C-alpha cells in the first residue's frame, strides 16, 4: 500500500528502461503534429469530421503490443504453448480500442498487421492462435454492445528485418461530436478516478497481472535468466544489455504475492475497459471531462490531456505485485517506475465530484477495482503532475 512521506523528488536521471533503448517520452514525434489535424487539440487522441455523417467525427488509431511478442515467443520455445500468441490479439485490440474510448468513440472496424521471421517463428501456429484470439475477443466485445468488424490486415515475412515477430493493429471509430470527451473542460475541482489493471473482472476468464503492454523490455530483461539470450540469441539485441534475472518463464512466483508464473504474468492480456466505459458514458457522460488510458508513460499519461491542469494523485493505492517484483529485480528508481508502468491503474476518469460515488458503484458492479486517486488543480503554462507515494513525492511536467 502507498503511504506518505515528506521527500520530494524532481531530479532528472537516466532510467533503467532508457538504458535499454526505450524512450517513454517519444522525443521526435512532435514533428508529425504539423501535418496532423484534430478537432479537439486537448483530447487524448485525434478526431476529424466524418465526411458522410454530419455531426459525427472519426478517429483512426494505430498501436501494437510492444516487445510482448518476444515473451510469447520464449514461452512457445520453452513450453510449446501458443497461449502467449493468442493473448497478443487482445493486447492489440485493447491498446487501440481503449485509446479511442478516451474521446468517447466506439470502434467500428479493425485491421491487424503481423510481421515475422518464419525461420524462427512458427508462422501457421502464430496465425492460427491470433485468429482464434481475435475471434474470441471480438465476439466478447459484441456481447457487450461493441460491434467492431474485423476488416482484414497484412502478414509480412521479413526475415532480414526481424529477429522474431511484431504485431500491431489499426481501429476506426466514430463519435457524436456533441458527446465527445475533448479534454478541454478538465478543470480544478475535478476528481480523478482510477480503474485497476490487474485481478479479474466479471467479464474476464482469468486473473490478470495488470502488466498491459508497456515496460515489457525492462520487465523481461530484469526477470528472466541470462541463459535465454544464449539459448535464443534472437530475443535480444547483442549491442543492448541482456537478460539478468533469476527466473525461468515457467517459474511460479509467490514473491510480492504474484501468485502465477513469470510467463503468465508477462503475457497477461491487456484489459479492455471499453465495455465498462460505454456504460459510464451513457449514464454519466455529462459529468466526465477527461479519459486517460495509462499506456506509454504509465501513470504520467494524463499529462497529454487538457491544458493548464495540475493533476494531483495522492490517494493510497495498492501497487500490483508484478510491478513491485520488477522494481525489486531491476532496481529502477521509483520516479521512473511511475513513468514506465501503469502500476496497477490502467485507466483514469476525470469527472465532476457530484458523480463520483455513482461512477464508482457502476464500475465496481463489473467486478472492476476502482477508487479515487486524487484531484485536478490549476497549473500555469503547461500541465503538471504530482504523485505522492511511500517512495517519495514525484513531480512531472508536460511538454
Show the residue positions of the predicted features:
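Helix-biased detector of long, well-ordered alpha-helical tracts
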Residues: 2-399
